[in-house]
Amino acid sequence: MIIERCRELALRAPARVVFPDALDQRVLKAAQYLHQQGLATPILVANPFELRQFALSHGVAMDGLQVIDPHGNLAMREEFAHRWLARAGEKTPPDALEKLTDPLMFAAAMVSAGKADVCIAGNLSSTANVLRAGLRIIGLQPGCKTLSSIFLMLPQYSGPALGFADCSVVPQPTAAQLADIALASAETWRAITGEEPRVAMLSFSSNGSARHPCVANVQQATEIVRERAPKLVVDGELQFDAAFVPEVAAQKAPASPLQGKANVMVFPSLEAGNIGYKIAQRLGGYRAVGPLIQGLAAPMHDLSRGCSVQEIIELALVAAVPRQTEVNRESSLQTLVE
């Protein structure tokens, strides 16, 4: 249902999706599919000759795909360097023009400057390099203190779709950071799915069944979330089964507002979250779409290097939803005005 919703929105307002890790047959196949289906306008960042030779050697068509070479676009790099200087001031490196020949940095600059709507990277680059490019070129949203991520977990056979956060960015979040992650994840879930988030703050304890500094950290984070978003349905600390299985919730957390029906799972650490999503993916029959990076001033998202063509396509569709929702809202308002 979620991917179908994203597909419908994409057909109404296709996004410009830039791929900096373009020398990858998975990206070429995904880009060709998005283009042929009218779901997006893919932009590949690479040397055109090198990319076409690569595509030819792998038997992948490139008909209709736009390719941009950072080395051959000095004017764009100069524009991006000027924007970088205006935003970062003295922190801008003296060799900014040269650094912008890097596909990751160039793609991040395209999104920051409005030359593309979404950047999808990470199929070849490490998460650290993707985040570094995002932070250096795009920067954080105004008021944002914590960069984080969320995976959209989609069932292949049965079960509900879920959000898993944070599985990629913050290793040992403080209570304040955990609260930031929960609030950002709730907002992302609502924007992408159109559903109200039901947030579970996970731990190895349910409602004080264990005492430990890690448990106290989750409890404190839950209170911060409640103070900052009193209308949000949130509970913690909870074990996964108490957050996900109504029958278990009735035993372990009978007073929980979630009643075992949480749809956004906030893990207490990166270690727990990363292990958890991979178990759900490899043993539980769930597809992992993402991670969607939360907190950057423009959308730049990170794939797992083990991603499939389908996962690249789905992340491109999902990542564009907030922008498409805004486009549709503006269109509706314009219609009302007219």
Curated annotation (Swiss-Prot):
pH dependence as annotated: Optimum pH is 7.8.
Compartment list: Cytoplasm
Molecular function (Gene Ontology), one example: protein homodimerization activity
EC number: 2.3.1.8
Keywords: Acyltransferase, Cytoplasm, Transferase
Enzyme class, first EC level, given as a word: transferase
Principal cellular location given in the protein's record: cytoplasm
One Gene Ontology CC term in the entry: cytoplasm
InterPro entries: P_Ac_Bu_trans, P_AcTrfase, P_AcTrfase_dom1, P_AcTrfase_dom2, Phos_Acetyltrans/Butyryltrans, PTA_PTB
Summary of activators and inhibitors of this protein: Activated by pyruvate, unaffected by NADH, ATP and PEP, unlike Pta.
Pathway involvement of the protein, from the record: Amine and polyamine degradation; ethanolamine degradation
GO biological process terms, semicolon-separated: ethanolamine catabolic process; response to heat
Cytoplasm among keywords: yes
Pfam families: PTA_PTB
Catalytic activity: acetyl-CoA + phosphate = acetyl phosphate + CoA
Keyword Cell membrane applies: no
Similarity field: Belongs to the phosphate acetyltransferase and butyryltransferase family.
Subunit note: Homodimer.
Its biological purpose: When expressed independently of the eut operon it can restore growth to a double pta-acs deletion mutant.
Name used for this protein in its record: Phosphate acetyltransferase EutD
Lineage: Bacteria, Pseudomonadati, Pseudomonadota, Gammaproteobacteria, Enterobacterales
Encoding gene per record: eutD
